């Protein structure tokens, strides 16, 4: 493990919340706290991506997004990192595989909103992600039906588990939890010029 990389010990469970965080906002904080409480995680790492292959416009500079995320998310069990840039990975499947190599003995859980589950089947090697690590899905009101009808949810319907044991589950495994609404999005914040 390199200097400056987040710490995690053998046997610990780390939730991975990836995104551009352009900008990070209270909705990210909210789902992070929910994930810590509901999925049996020791840590959550915000993986601030160098770029998002599914978005047409480049994000703000990585260092700025990481600094602003750290200023917003102050929790003793949360780490903000730009580790994907150091790993040289572009896609989530590569990032997860790289983290598993760099942190043997650490269990990882991929975290996502239900809006991402609804289009997860469009991600590069999404089925490899499901095969490598459990996936924790957090749904705001109104997102449940579309997400549960999504191709990924249908294909892995038999791998759905209860939320509390997700951190100890063998992949493929996923859990779906409803969370109270915090109506914020990075796109809307950028459009208003608040970023």
Curated annotation (Swiss-Prot):
Gene of this entry: nadD
Pathway: Cofactor biosynthesis; NAD(+) biosynthesis; deamido-NAD(+) from nicotinate D-ribonucleotide: step 1/1
SUPFAM superfamilies: Nucleotidylyl transferase (SSF52374)
HAMAP family reported in the protein's UniProt record: NaMN_adenylyltr
UniProt-recorded Gene Ontology molecular function terms: ATP binding; nicotinate-nucleotide adenylyltransferase activity
Signal sequence, start to end: none
Role summary: Catalyzes the reversible adenylation of nicotinate mononucleotide (NaMN) to nicotinic acid adenine dinucleotide (NaAD).
Family per record: Belongs to the NadD family.
Keyword rRNA-binding: no
One family name in Pfam for this protein: CTP_transf_like
A Gene Ontology BP annotation from the UniProt entry: NAD biosynthetic process
UniProt keyword annotation of Transferase present: yes
Name of the protein described by the UniProt record: Probable nicotinate-nucleotide adenylyltransferase
Highest taxon of the lineage: Bacteria
The enzyme's E.C. designation: 2.7.7.18
């Amino acid at each position: 493990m390199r200097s400056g990389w987040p710490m995690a010990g053998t046997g610990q469970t780390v939730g991975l919340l990836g995104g551009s965080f352009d900008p990070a906002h209270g909705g990210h904080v909210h789902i992070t706290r929910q994930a810590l409480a509901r999925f049996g995680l020791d840590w959550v790492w915000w993986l601030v991506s160098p770029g998002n292959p599914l978005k047409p416009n480049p994000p703000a500079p990585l260092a700025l997004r990481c600094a602003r995320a750290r200023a917003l998310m102050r929790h003793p069990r949360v780490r903000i990192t730009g580790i994907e840039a150091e790993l040289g990975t572009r896609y989530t499947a590569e990032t997860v595989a790289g983290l598993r190599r760099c942190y043997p003995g650490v269990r990882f859980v991929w975290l996502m909103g239900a809006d991402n589950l609804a289009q997860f089947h469009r991600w590069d090697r999404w089925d490899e992600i499901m095969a490598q690590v459990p996936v924790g899905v957090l749904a705001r009101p109104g997102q449940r039906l579309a997400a549960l009808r999504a191709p990924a949810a249908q294909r892995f319907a038999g791998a759905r588990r209860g939320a509390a044991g997700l951190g100890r589950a063998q992949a493929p495994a996923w859990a779906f939890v409803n969370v109270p609404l915090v109506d914020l999005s990075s796109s809307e914040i950028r459009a208003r010029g608040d970023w």
